[in-house]
Amino acid sequence: MVAPISYLTLYNAHNGDSVKIPKPIRFHSLNGLKSFIHESFTDYIISDIENIFLLTSFGMKVKFNIINELNDIYVFDKRLFSGARDETIINAYVNQNEGGYKEMIKPTPSSLVKLEKTNIKQMTSSLKVNDGWSKALFQDCLGVVGQMKAYVKQINTIFKCLNIIFQFGSNFINGIEKSFNNYLNYIKLLNLKTLHRSWNGYYNNLRKFPSFQLKNGTGNIKISDHLNTSELEKSSSFVSKTLPLVINKFNEMSASINSVNDDKVNVDKLIESLRNESIENFKDYDTGSEDIIKDVSRLSQLISHDIDKLSTNVSISLDWVYRIHKDEISPKIFDKATGLYKILQNLYLFKNKIVDESLSIFGKIANLQMRMVNIKNDLRILTNADDNNDIANENEISIHVINNIKSAEDYLSLTIDLPLLFGFMLIEKRRQFEWHEFYSKGIVNNVSEQLSVIIDHEKIFRKLWLKKFGNFLSILNSKDENDALRTVLPSIDVTLVNGNAESNSTFGIINNIQVERDDISTYINALEEYSNAGTTSSPSSKKFSELMKKNFQDLIKCTNNMKRVTKMVSSLSSFTSPVANEIKNNDKLLANSKDENNDKQAEGGGHMSELGEVDYDINLVKGLKIRIRKLENLLHQQQYKDLSNWPVTRSNGANATSTSETDGKFSLILDSNQKTSTSSNSKIDPTNLLQRRQTLPLKLGHEKPTTSQQSNHLDVSTTIDKHLDNIRLKKENNELTNENLKLSNTNRTNEKLIEALNKQISNLKTVNDDQNKHHEEKLRKRDAENQQTITRLETELQAFKPQNNKEVVDLKDKLSLRDAEILDLRKDITRLHDVNEGFTEEVTKLNEKIATLQSDINDVNAMKKDLLSNMASKETDTINHRISLEEEIKKLHSKIEELTEDYENLMDLTQSKHNNLDIMVNYLNNMIIHLLSSIKCLVEQQFETFIEFCFILESMGLLLIKEHNNNKNLDEYKITRVKGLKSKRNDKIVPTSANGNVLDETPIVSTMGNMPTSKVVDDINKIIGWVDDIQSFKNISTKSSEDGDEKSCSANTAGSVSSSVIDDLPEEITNLSVEETNKFNRQSLELVKLFRDIFKSSNGSISKFEDFINTIRFKENICINQNQDDSGVSNKFFLGAITKRFKDVEGFAKKLTKENKSKAHELSQLIGKLNCKISMNSFEMDDLVLFLPTRIDRAEEIDENFQPWAAFNIGAPHYFLRVQKNEGNKTGITHSIKDKEWMVGRVTYIEEHTVTDANFNDKDANPFHLSTGVVWYVVDAKEEIF
């Protein structure tokens, strides 16, 4: 399986933006990563990579060697930590990723207004426009939710960055505070234990310490005399004067640190308050926004569903649907969209708020760090020694003053500790003396002797071997004299350097005194008496005697260890002596006979202890004769050395002369002839004593050695060889000593374990024997008592048997009980025997364990030998490898120098080429800038021409639209007729086709008052968005280029290009500085990028420029309505649409004229019919109404002169005919209807009245006695006669 790709995420701490970089990181250094952040991530807002500050998620600085192990890196701008508020920088960061917030339009209310029921067509059109409005608003809501999520993510990132920078500052502060606290605790401890006030009492007690005399001393010693009273007073005065100053200084620094911590807590509270505010305001934004989206979607679908029902179901009331959409659904959609937009607005404002607050947080953190830096500098002055000022002013607190206080306190503390210190000096001086004595006289001398004896043993063995097999070897080596075997071994000389013990130790007041162990014991007793007498007031002084005793025991242990080392060194030669084999054989015999008799002494050279351990002391006595002979030989050799002044010291490879030959004595191994010749030669020439003896090889080969061969065997070692050999030998000796110490410790541990086990075994045996003896003694006593009791009872039985048989029976019972007790005792004895056997088995197991430990010791010794041999070989390999590496380094250095020279020459050759290419590139840059500016002017002019065409079309009621062609399955541009476009161009309208179908349900809303209504203008405006890139590029050009752009643009407008600016460009470019050249190099990259974006096609799609040209020509993807009259004009997109519009208007005008005539005739006929029909409800002017006489139900009195007439109606009561005077007027039909049963009249006037509590009883205001609140009408009518 392919491993998933991991990313490194960069977060901008000032706007919450982020970017991901795949791992592993392809940058070669941290500056490379910073350059990427400067160019791509921050868009050059940060201005310089030195202003970039990177932190990890743990508040630590980023290290490039671990960058691939990180997942998150947080980017900070150092300029925002200065404390000065730079609004331009923070605004640039905010505007970098604000998204589409400023482009989002605030939700607008529905365009539905109150319409009359009869206006069906307008209601239908308004409902369709409202459907498009709801869908558009739903899409806007989705965009708002997406932007809300982006803002929430950015806010969370900013909060995390605030926590990280706070953690970074806290770590910095805590580190300095921790260092300060260490010194503060030291000063506090110094102040707590100061003696500048109480030293007098301790000094007086010290003066009471008794004087004493050493065995080798010259007089009595009184330790209080070693302290100077004036010096004590001076130290006390100095401490009392300077210590308060030091304490005050540290208290001031502690107060500053506490103030910093308080400010740090305030910063933390500020961050926490911002976080709590965000939680309080936006904790439910997820669920709230989702609910709003669901509600808006549901309501929008409900609007679309109602409109679909209107087109399919005629029974649904249009007026009801219109009223529901206008009064209920549309306001809900608008309210929810407005609420969602308000949440987005609050998020945007809160993000800007925390960005603004972060500036103060950054400034406070930087201020805290600067204050801690000042504290750190003050602490450094107080704690670091100044080599240039050895004498510091007492009033100025420094490290010198603190050290002087410590020295003064140490001197004052001697008033308490001097008895203990003096005792330690006595013990240490004695320990060093004993160690030096054992080392110089015991170890060094014995090592020299033992090593020489070991060499002699090897010589003897080689000579014996040559005696047995040399005859055969001489036959094989007869032709090659150089291969003759010789009995030659290296010599050794161990000397003690710097061996004066008195000159190597300094003890001040007891330098010239020889200390004995009895002196130490006497001093300890005096110290105990001094402590027990109660003269001291210090609690710690009562423990002085215990400490002295413990130190004295350590001295004894150290001396005993040196004794053991000396004993071990003295036994080295016993392992290689001729009797060593006998010792080993005896060891085996003793080990085999150990089980038979552990107390017998083994026969042979050694003794075996109870644990089978060989005692080599007796064997060493047997080897003393050999060592004495060796010493005699060395003495004889030294005498000849003094006579001839010939060097005696040998190197490892030097050939030493056999000691058995130098003194003239005969060897027991060699022949008599050889001995005689050797003795005679040594008497003739003393220097021949130092030559290698080759008598045996000469005899075997029957040849005489030449003079050159003899000279080769001389010792030609130099002082340098001796020094190197001594160094190597010392190193090996140290290693062997360390290894020997380890093995000794292991052996000592095993011996202690064996001793403990032996003690345990002996204790168990003793306990077991004691128990056996005790039980046997107890058993004997019990048997004797029983026997006496039986005899006594038998006697009594015989005496009392005739008298009392009952007592006899009782006595028998008691006897049986005693027998049972005896049996129990015997069982206890048997059990103890079993326990004893168990202890015996345990002892056997312990013996086996001891044998195992002994074998482990042997294995460790063998391992030590292997390690020594491996170390020697590894050292040789290391030296050879180092020499080869040094040769390779020299070769590489020479190659580097050659490559450096070649590289410098190559750089000189290519520098001139680069300069010429830079000039040409800069010239081409300016040419491209002028061309791009000209293209920009042409595109803008073409776009303005297109806008003019759109205005012409809209002035004629035509609209350029883009709709989807289902047959061709592509979007086509089409010019269509839109009703009401001329009068309501800035209102929301619906484009329709010729057959009345809606072409685009999205409401057409003009965002600018001087722009056409067509949405195609916005599409083309988006297509030419790349023109703004040219404008932004021109802003970063040089002054000459910008002037040239303006001239070029104006010239292109006139149809020509300015050549004066272009001709001047090369001369200006050649005079550019390095900074300007770098600027043009960046411009070159930006121009290439801009050219690719505008003119290069990618992924099979056309370029942006070709897209604009193809679109603005309107030659492709267009729908043209063919005109039969003029095919040449109708093939043109805009001209054909305009011509068709004029012809449609003419045809439509003719059609309307004809229809108006027919409609006028039909209208006159309908009016005539309508005037002859009686109305029954909703009475209006000119309606024909039937009036009938009626009566008043609640009238108390009937007025015969007043007859009310009511209009015949359905659902419209209280319409009464005016038949009497009203405000001085009298109707014309008062007398004509007096005797009629009905009357038909045409309404001329209708007057409305309302019955209230005030006019209820008024006959004029309520002539018909109607109830309160009833609305009634008075109708003036003209009688119609048929």
From Swiss-Prot:
Residues 593-602 have a biased composition (Basic and acidic residues). Transmembrane segments: none annotated. Its main location: membrane. It comes from the Eukaryota. It is found in: Preautophagosomal structure membrane; Vacuole membrane. Keywords: Autophagy, Coiled coil, Membrane, Protein transport, Transport, Vacuole. Involved in cytoplasm to vacuole transport (Cvt), pexophagy, mitophagy and nucleophagy. Recruits mitochondria for their selective degradation via autophagy (mitophagy) during starvation. Works as scaffold proteins that recruit ATG proteins to the pre-autophagosome (PAS), the site of vesicle/autophagosome formation. Required for the Cvt vesicles completion. This is Autophagy-related protein 11. It comes from Debaryomyces hansenii (strain ATCC 36239 / CBS 767 / BCRC 21394 / JCM 1990 / NBRC 0083 / IGC 2968) (Yeast). The lineage of its organism: Eukaryota, Fungi, Dikarya, Ascomycota, Saccharomycotina.
